Amino acid sequence: MESSSDIKIYETFDEMGLPDTLLRGIYSYGYEKPSKIQSMAIVPFKEGNDILGQANSGTGKTATFCISSMCRIDLTIKKPQVMILVPTQELAKQIYEVAKNIGVYLPVSCLCATGGMSIRDDIHAIQQGVQLVVGTPGRIYDLMNRNILTTENMKCLILDEADQMLEDRFYKQVMCILEIGFPNTTRVALFSATMPKEVIEVANKLLQNPVRILIPPEKVTLEGIKQYMVQLDKEEWKYEVLCDIYKQLNINQALIYCNTRKRSEWLADKLSTDGYPLMCIHGEMENSERRKRMEEFRSGRVRVLISTDLLARGIDVQHVSLVINFELPMNRENYIHRIGRSGRFGKKGCSINILCPNETKMKDDIEKFYSIVMEELPLDLGSIVL
């Protein structure tokens, strides 16, 4: 699959024909010039084309669909016109904040609708005239099934992290939402950092003559992110190596990934007991506690966060300079999502993969698939620039 051949690239936001009020929001939010995905995708979606868009993590996918979809909202109609489906509450909240900030000079009403939050508040907000809704499939389907969230005025349907949204976990929920029905004029966009063949096949059934903006996997660059590995003979040596890294590196903010809740909690308890300040977050935690801990990390009050793949996708924490994979992810697609947390928006970043023998096959698979080479971690960690 290749990108469409006739895509016009816009070097500035001013060239895109965006409303002045939207441009003010874009610039006040801190954007200066479009990223590659923004330069290629905003105008086609704004002008009524379906989009299949791929760009690696941290390149501005969220702003791409927020900007283009806001252009399609009829400000005189106080009904839902944009629906954005995402896999996690944290990602929904992030997109909601981006939409609010970019649209700050527009009279656009936005709603973040996810499980764990009051559905009464969601219903009230929609009845008051919400125009853009971002949420997780379960809550969105519930609101649609109650005939509270209706689609007759829907201009845009967006699936973010499409590779995850169209896999088994969410596939049925997403299909139920689609089966409720959207007008033929509703434009659909799928965005993700990775586009496995299976997902492209499903996407082709959902999209009408889409503009394809695809970066092949071997070109999904992790430029600016130095990738190291430590190969160990025994699993139980991992903790000691992690402590050595912790002691020697001057870390601004770091994410440490484990594959399961149990493993994350074990590691967090062990590090805390040994005097290392950090927090742990996972999908089975109470929503209020997850939000609290995420805010602590995002604000910089907590510098190290241990996580499962809950945070691998789409969470924008600007000052993360180091990602440590205490365990390699169980699928190669999550590798790029994980280490994309460092080196956001062109900043330098570093990832360290702590490996035991049973992870060698996955390491080789990742290196081959993404055409990368993980370097041996130098003994002198002072040579690593974060």
Describe the predicted segments one by one.
Residues E2-L386:
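Conserved helicase RecA-like core
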